[in-house]
């Protein structure tokens, strides 16, 4: 079996290439003309001539050319029809009848011999097939496929065999035109190789220049540069093919260049755009890092300011601590003096201090004060210290009396609560009333005690408000300016006001203690101590009967009942009517929350904080209908005790419902005094609540007065109150 044409031994026509050849068969049989024809292409002058390329196509057609030097046109062309099956070609040797003669061999030699002026017919005219002969067919099969090693000794003349490479990769099929040009232009191939390398080098230099110009090589990151080198440099397989095979490089020169082998201008543009974008991102990152660095530096400088602020805060804290220590020391002194006063106090059987032992001390202070006024050589500083000590002692006494009255009031409230639950507490109420009456009597006796001068009594009333304002403000310098300007004036006023108080109290000795306290209070308020009158509010004496009502809302009524004895008494102000203190709301904090809780608890709807202007307008509208309420319209109960600086009612200190109830009770007192009946102001609460809560409040409170009239606890005080008023009018 013969091997395929891809084997190492392939039959080709001799060309101008200097390849190792060997002659098959005896060389003496060749004609001289044939030998000259074979040697003619090797002449230097005919090297660049055209040569005949005889190739075998897929159908086994042999192209032949004519030699102009032979002088005759060879009309005999051979055509071999071979059978190709896959990669195996079967060649049958010629039979016994097919003999090869010397003439035929010479003719074949002439056909294969190429003259110097042989024209290349490739690409000019299609190959023509000629009648075939058994001899030509055998020669064609010998050129198509190589036989075994035994066939190499076939006696053939004029044919040469080129030795193939023993160990090498399969060579690609080279086009005919490339093979012909490579055979005739060896130097041109080398020039093409150098030109291709120059083009590649120029592209590389161009890319590097662009990168240098754009600043890409100056960046610290090497990722984009490695990608550029991978894309700009040619494929290493192409370089290996150029160095290894010359035929492969010729094929690359003739064949169209693939777009992936060398980077195109479009790819370079995209790459440059990508690099520019990356450079822009890097610049943005650098700007962000710079901003963060500046911010960090600013944060590092901030602790200096914080340290200064901390130092200021420490200084303020130290000052506050020093002030607190001073206040604590002053408090210790006050406690020591208070203990001394309590030791001098003469207590009754029930433990209440009936009269203070301040008579000798007061006389001593007055006796010391007289010589001071007579001795001008004493400095003003000593006078100031003496006044401060005297005022401090008076303030301590007032504070002690206030604590005692507060405890009595708490006991009274607890007893009233027990009475409201149905417990038998009438005896306890009578006892508390008796204790309260004794306490008030003791206060009055303390002001009228022979051992205590009227000046000390007046000073007790005049200095209480003055000292309390100092206690809450905590400003020591305020005393200096006030005392310097009013020291002498205060001394002269003491004697005059003391004589006036003696006159007032002396003319009323035949009346009960409650009446004397009632008559003496307006004159104190006229002297400018309005807050002192408010503090004296809870110190109310019992009625003549010596018993208190069980209702907590009527504690303020004894003043009005005593005042109705004299029909010529002026109308009391709203401040006198609203003097009783009610319990603060529980379970809430803040004005808004307490107002909302009160509305939901008692009326089933939320209550917005009441404004001072709105309530004043409602009161004026209601009082305008009452002909006898002109004085009340001028003095509305809108004091800071019930409304804040922003004009909002203090729901967190007092329920608005209790406030309205107190207003209604005050109006009822005035109505009874003026008209003898309180039915005219029964709709006051409905008028106020309907404005703030709407019709729902009226429906919920529609049966309130009926229930109160049926309840013994609620009806008792009101009925007793009405009877007492009628009794007073009759008297």
UniProtKB/Swiss-Prot annotation:
One GO location term (cellular component): nucleus
Biased composition (Basic residues): 698-707
Motif (Nuclear localization signal): 485-505, 695-720
Region (Disordered) location: 1-155, 354-377, 447-572, 698-731
Tissue localization of expression: Expressed in early hematopoietic precursors.
Composition-biased stretches (Polar residues): 1-10, 62-75, 121-132
Location within or outside the cell: Cytoplasm, Cytoskeleton; Nucleus
Phosphoserine, modified sites: 43, 129, 146-148, 567
Keywords: Coiled coil, Cytoplasm, Cytoskeleton, Microtubule, Nucleus, Phosphoprotein
Residues forming coiled coils: 270-348, 377-417
GO function term, MF aspect, one: transcription corepressor activity
Chain positions with Phosphothreonine modification: 152
GO biological process, any: hemopoiesis
Biased amino acid composition, Basic and acidic residues: 364-375, 472-499, 508-543, 551-569
Function as written in the Swiss-Prot or TrEMBL entry: Regulator of pre-B-cell leukemia transcription factors (BPXs) function. Inhibits the binding of PBX1-HOX complex to DNA and blocks the transcriptional activity of E2A-PBX1. Tethers estrogen receptor-alpha (ESR1) to microtubules and allows them to influence estrogen receptors-alpha signaling.
Subunit structure: Interacts with TEX11. Interacts with ESR1, PBX1, PBX2 and PBX3.
Recorded domain comment: The C-terminal domain (AA 443-731) contains a nuclear export signal.
Protein name per Swiss-Prot or TrEMBL: Pre-B-cell leukemia transcription factor-interacting protein 1
Organism: Homo sapiens (Human)
């Amino acid at each position: 079996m013969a091997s395929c044409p891809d084997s190492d031994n392939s039959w080709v026509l001799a060309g101008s290439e200097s390849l190792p050849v060997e002659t098959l068969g005896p060389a003496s049989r060749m004609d001289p003309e044939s030998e000259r024809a074979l040697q003619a292409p090797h002449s230097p002058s005919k090297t660049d001539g055209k040569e005949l390329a005889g190739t075998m196509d897929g159908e086994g057609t042999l192209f032949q050319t004519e030699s102009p030097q032979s002088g005759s046109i060879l009309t005999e062309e051979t055509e071999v029809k071979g059978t190709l099956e896959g990669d195996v070609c079967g060649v049958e040797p010629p039979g016994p009848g097919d003999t090869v003669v010397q003439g035929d061999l010479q003719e074949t030699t002439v056909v294969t011999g190429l003259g110097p002026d042989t024209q290349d017919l490739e690409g000019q005219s299609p190959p023509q097939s000629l009648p075939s002969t058994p001899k030509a067919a055998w020669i064609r099969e010998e050129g198509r496929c190589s036989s075994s090693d035994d066939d190499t000794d076939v006696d053939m003349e004029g044919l040469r065999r080129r030795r193939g490479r023993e160990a090498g990769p399969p060579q690609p099929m080279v086009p005919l035109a490339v093979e012909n040009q490579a055979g005739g232009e060896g130097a041109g191939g080398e020039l093409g190789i150098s030109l291709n390398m120059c083009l590649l080098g120029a592209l590389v230099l161009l890319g590097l220049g662009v990168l240098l110009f754009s600043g890409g090589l100056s960046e610290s990151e090497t990722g984009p540069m490695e990608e550029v080198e991978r894309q700009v440099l040619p494929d290493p397989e192409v370089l290996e093919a150029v160095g290894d095979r010359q035929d492969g490089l010729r094929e690359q020169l003739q064949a169209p260049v693939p777009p992936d082998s060398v980077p195109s201008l479009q790819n370079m543009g995209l790459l440059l755009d990508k690099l520019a974008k990356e450079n822009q991102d890097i610049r943005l990152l650098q700007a962000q890092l710079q901003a963060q660095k500046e911010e960090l530096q600013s944060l590092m400088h901030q602790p200096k300011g914080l340290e200064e602020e901390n130092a200021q805060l420490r200084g303020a804290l130290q000052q506050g601590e020093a002030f607190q220590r001073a206040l604590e020391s002053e408090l210790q002194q006050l406690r020591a003096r208070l203990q001394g006063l309590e030791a001098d106090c003469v207590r009754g059987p029930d433990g209440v201090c009936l009269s203070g032992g301040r008579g000798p001390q007061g006389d001593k202070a007055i006796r010391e004060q007289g010589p001071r006024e007579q001795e001008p050589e004493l400095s003003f500083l000593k006078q100031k210290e003496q006044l401060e000590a005297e005022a401090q002692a008076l303030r301590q006494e007032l504070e002690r009396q206030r604590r005692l009255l507060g405890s009595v009031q708490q006991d009274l409230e607890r007893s009233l609560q027990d009475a409201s639950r149905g417990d038998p507490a009438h005896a306890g109420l009578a006892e508390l009333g008796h204790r309260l009456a004794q306490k008030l009597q003791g206060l009055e006796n303390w002001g009228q005690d022979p051992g205590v001068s009227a000046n000390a009594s007046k000073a007790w009333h005049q200095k209480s408000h003055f000292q309390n304002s100092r206690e809450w403000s905590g400003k020591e310098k305020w005393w200096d300016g006030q005392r310097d300007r009013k020291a002498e004036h205060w001394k002269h006023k003491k004697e005059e006001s003391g004589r006036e108080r003696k006159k007032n109290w002396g003319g009323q000795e035949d009346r009960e203690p409650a009446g004397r306290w009632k008559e003496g209070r307006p004159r104190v308020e006229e002297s400018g101590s309005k807050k002192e009158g408010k503090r004296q509010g809870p110190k109310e004496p019992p009625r003549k009967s010596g018993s208190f009502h069980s209702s907590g809302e009527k504690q303020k009524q004894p003043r009005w009942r005593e005042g109705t004895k004299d029909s010529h008494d002026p109308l009391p102000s709203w401040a006198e009517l609203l003097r009783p203190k009610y319990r603060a709301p529980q379970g809430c904090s803040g004005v808004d929350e307490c107002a909302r809780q009160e509305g939901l608890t008692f009326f089933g709807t939320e209550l917005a904080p009441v404004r001072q202007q709105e309530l004043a307008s409602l009161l004026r509208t209601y009082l305008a209908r009452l002909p006898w309420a002109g004085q009340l319209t001028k003095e509305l109960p809108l004091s800071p005790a019930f409304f804040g600086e922003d004009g909002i009612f203090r729901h967190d200190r007092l329920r608005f419902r209790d406030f309205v109830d107190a207003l209604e009770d005050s109006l009822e007192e005035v109505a009874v005094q003026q008209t003898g009946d309180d039915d005219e102001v029964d709709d006051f609460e409905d008028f106020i609540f309907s404005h703030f809560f709407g019709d729902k409040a009226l429906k919920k409170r529609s049966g309130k007065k009926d229930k109160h009239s049926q309840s013994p606890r609620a009806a008792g005080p009101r009925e007793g109150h009405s009877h007492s008023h009628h009794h007073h009018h009759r008297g």
